């Protein structure tokens, strides 16, 4: 059993290799996506203090008035400004609430950060982002398996990578966890016993310490692309299959001459149903004639995300203030589902904690790179010893 596990662990490590290192390292960088975006767009985030700042409704009107060809679809308070974004979430104008002036326009999917997001989140399938490969956007053959429906080649790559990371974590527990007789050896660091002992101990200790995060990233990462993984996890932990219609909202019919609610009206209605701050709001469209108000409460698992930091959605019929639907994972489902939605999945991104605490996520996100370096070091050392012994025998 030990040799079998060791063999398959080694093979999966080879397959993961650079893919795992690139995926994990890019993910570690993207933990600070919001902070890096704000730092690299200082003019965009310029804002002034005012006793009477403008609100989201006014910001939307300012942008649509000055840029009538811009398809404004949402508005979000972020970093002191009011961002008015496009319907395809690709760009946004920043409005200074203190002066009502437009600071400028930003490409939300461009640059180095956009490339990293496209690589890490989409496997180069995000439309309109740098590096997109059209070949990876095609669906994979289902081979009669319904759970593969709508899965692209890019999604399959990410899903398999997540599953392999999960297997690597499980096999790592089997290989690295010490017996009770030599418990202390599993966490020792022989820093003065030579290169091989040092790197071997670093490999083992860092590996076992990072296991909880690797398992979390593996499960949630695979589940993003392969929903069957989430269903399996929830079934094992006492939950139920996710409600696929949870975020569907069909506004009821109203009189054709019924007045349209304003952004301020929709925001006020949302606050009547949910305590918290408004993260962002999408405006009605011909295809979806309602407001969607994303809210963040005291516990905000996505609270440190740029623009889209809410975890509770309030749908408001744009012509009927009494036609409202609240989607909150804290209510109406088993505890296992709530834990997954409110803790487990958000932990993948680290947005539930501040940037200082996210240093822990960053350090553990770099472990695949460290494990590769220490693994190569011990392998090259053993290979060198074997060569010298062979030469001595000959």
PLM regions and their residue ranges:
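Conserved histidines in hydrophobic membrane contexts and catalytic metal-binding motifs
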Residues: 1-394
